[in-house]
Amino acid sequence: MRFKQPSRRDRPVMFKRSKNVSVDVGVDSISDLPDAVLQHIFSYIPTELAIRTSVLSKRWRHVWSETPHLSFEWLKVSPKLINKTLASYTASKIKSFHLCTRYSYEADTHHVNSSIEFAMSHNVDDLSLAFRRCSPFYNFDDCFYTNSSLKRVELRYVDLMPRCMVSWTSLKNLSLTDCTMSDESFLEILSGCPILESLSLKFCMSLKYLNLSKSLRLTRLEIERISYIRAPMLSMQIVAPYIHYLRLRDSEAHCTFVDVSSLTEANVDVSTFHPRTCYHDFDPLDPHDLLVMVQTMLKTFQKVEKLTLGVNLLQMLSLSKIPSLPLPMLKVKTLTLETMIIRSVVPGIARLLQNLPGLKKITVYTTNPCNTEVEPCVNSYLDAQDLNPDQWWRLDDVVFPISSEYEVLKPEIMASFMELLLANTRTLETLVVELGSCVARSRFKELFQIALTLSHDKKVSIMLKRSNG
C-alpha cells in the first residue's frame, strides 16, 4: 500500500492584510446585525461582560436581556448583583445557565436558591452549577429534582440527597464532579431519568456500587477516580449492561465490572499510584496485584472492537510475572495507544498485540512524561522490600529509553517501535503514529523514509503525523 506524505492542507495557513486595504474605524457595522446574531455572540462571553457592552451602543442596551445563554462567575460578581441582573431579564426561555460560586452556607444559600429557581422557572435546557470546594457542600431544595425541561445537567461540589421523587424526564446528559451521594440516593436519581444517554462521574468517591441496569438508554459512561494521600482507596462495582462506550481513569484499577455485556468501545488507563506505593501509612501495593487487576479488567472487554489503553496500564502488562496470568483473546479491530515510547511499555504492548488476532488498525499518540507512571512507583515498593526490580520487569530490549531518560527520540528508536508493532500483528492494515514533539522536526524526513520502506516491506499503510510546534 502507498505511504503518503502529509499534504499542505494539514499545515497552518497564514493570512496577511494587503497594504492597499483600508479600514474605516468610524463605521459601526456590528450594530446593524440582527438581535439573534448579537445574542449568539453574547452566548460566548460571561453575562456580566455582555451587559457592559451596552455602553458601546444604544442599540445593544437591552439585547443581552433576551439572550438565551446566561453565565455568571461569583468570583467577580456579588450574589446580590446577580439577582438584580436576573430581575431585568425578559426572555421567557433560557437555553443554558452557568453559575460558579465560592458558596457560603450562611451568606449565600438564599441567593443560590433564588438563582436556581429562576433558571428552572424559565425552562432551562442546559444547567451548569459549579460550587467551589467548601464545607458544607450545597444541598438542593426539593424543587430542583422535579423539572421536565432539563436536557443536560453538570454539577460540581454538591450533596445529592433527594428527599422527594426525582423527575428529570427530558435529561439526556448528566455530569457530576466531586459530588457526595450514597448508592441509594444515586439510584433514586437514575430512576427519575428515563431517557438518560450519557453519564460522567469524576471523583465521586462515595459511590461503591453503580447499578445502571435500569438505565436502558444509557450508552456512554465516563468514570474518573483518584486515591487521596491520607485515605485508603475504595473499590467500586459497576453494573452497566447497556453502555456501548466507556472511558475510565481509575486509581490503582479498583473498579470491578459485573456486567458490561454491550460494551464495544473502551478508553482505559490507571491514573495514580502514589498513596499506597510512596507512603507508608497503608500496606504497600504488591505488583502482583496490579497484574490480577489488569487481567480481570481485560476479561470484561472481550466484545470490545475499539480499545484505547494508556501508558500506566501498558506498563502493568510489562511486569514479568504476567505469563502466570494468561490474558484473554480479544476481538479488538482498532487499537489506540496513548503512551511514551519507553522500555517499560514495550513488553506489555507486544503481549497485548499477540492477543488481538483480528486487529486492523493501530493509532499511537505519543505523550509527555508524567508523575504517575507505574515503573517508578513499583520500583519504590520493591526497593522498600529489598527486592530486585529486574526480577519483576521484562525489560530486555535496551534500544528503548527508560522513563527518566525520555526526551526527544532518535528516528531509529521510533522506527524500532514501529517494527515492534508490525512484528506482533498478522492482520494489520493501517498504522498511524501521532508523533507530537517526540521526534525533532529536522529529522522527520529521515523517519518518513524509514516508514516508507516499512510500509512497502510489510504491506501496511503507515501515516506519520506531528504537531506544528
From Swiss-Prot:
Q: Which PROSITE patterns match?
A: FBOX (PS50181)
Question: Which UniProt key words apply to this protein?
Answer: Leucine-rich repeat, Repeat
SMART domains cross-referenced by the UniProt entry = FBOX
CDD domains in the cross-refs? F-box_AtFBL13-like
List the cysteine pairs that form cystine: none
Database matches in Pfam families: F-box, LRR_At1g61320_AtMIF1
Q: Which residues form the F-box domain?
A: 27-77
Concerning Gene3D superfamilies, the annotation shows: 1.20.1280.50, Ribonuclease Inhibitor
Q: Where are the LRR repeats?
A: 30-58, 178-203, 204-214, 223-250, 296-321, 341-366
What is the recorded name of this protein? Putative F-box/LRR-repeat protein At5g02930
Species per Swiss-Prot/TrEMBL record? Arabidopsis thaliana (Mouse-ear cress)
